[in-house]
Amino acid sequence: MHSLSQRANTIVCFGGIVLVGVLLLNVLSRAFFSDHVDVDIKLNEIHRFNTQRNFEYSFISIDLDANLEPLFNWNTKMLFLYVTAEYRTKQNVLSQVVVWDHILTEKSKANIHEKRLSKYPIINQGLGLKNNTIKLTFNYNVVPISGILTRHQVGTSEFKFPTTYMKEAY
């Protein structure tokens, strides 16, 4: 006859093995879900482009069309979406600035057709944005219930800053 502690140990160990097995199947099932989405991103407007002392700042708005519904499955907890602006200057080899971000938790809201999205300014330490090419990139992280967080980049667009500073829309 086994004691109560031996029986409890057997049950806990068996439960742990079953849990690890289910989590392993969950991680392996990730290979069957597509991570590809079509995204269209473009500059809508440069609202302000100015300088103060030794830094430049700009407010831009973007247009975004994306259908992210294929990314939602039984293992998707949420999507972290963000748009980066990348540029190069003489002082910096590569600068990346987040200009918009959003956390998406529902599949019903995963079809995005937004105009004039604007959240964060582009701030460049130093002077080098005039007539500089900026690359907008849509990025997303798939945050699973269990498994590895994955990062993806899709949809890019480029635009040039004006050759002069401005306070009004360009």
Swiss-Prot record:
Glycans are attached at N131. InterPro entries: SPC3. Residues 1-7 are cytoplasmic. GO terms for biological process: protein targeting to ER; signal peptide processing. It is found in: Endoplasmic reticulum membrane. Its main location: endoplasmic reticulum. Residues 29-170 are lumenal. Keywords: Endoplasmic reticulum, Glycoprotein, Membrane, Signal-anchor, Transmembrane, Transmembrane helix. It is a single-pass type II membrane protein. The chain crosses the membrane at residues 8-28. Essential component of the signal peptidase complex (SPC) which catalyzes the cleavage of N-terminal signal sequences from nascent proteins as they are translocated into the lumen of the endoplasmic reticulum. Essential for the SPC catalytic activity, possibly by stabilizing and positioning the active center of the complex close to the lumenal surface. PANTHER family: MICROSOMAL SIGNAL PEPTIDASE 23 KD SUBUNIT SPC22/23, SIGNAL PEPTIDASE COMPLEX SUBUNIT 3. This is Signal peptidase complex subunit 3. It comes from Dictyostelium discoideum.
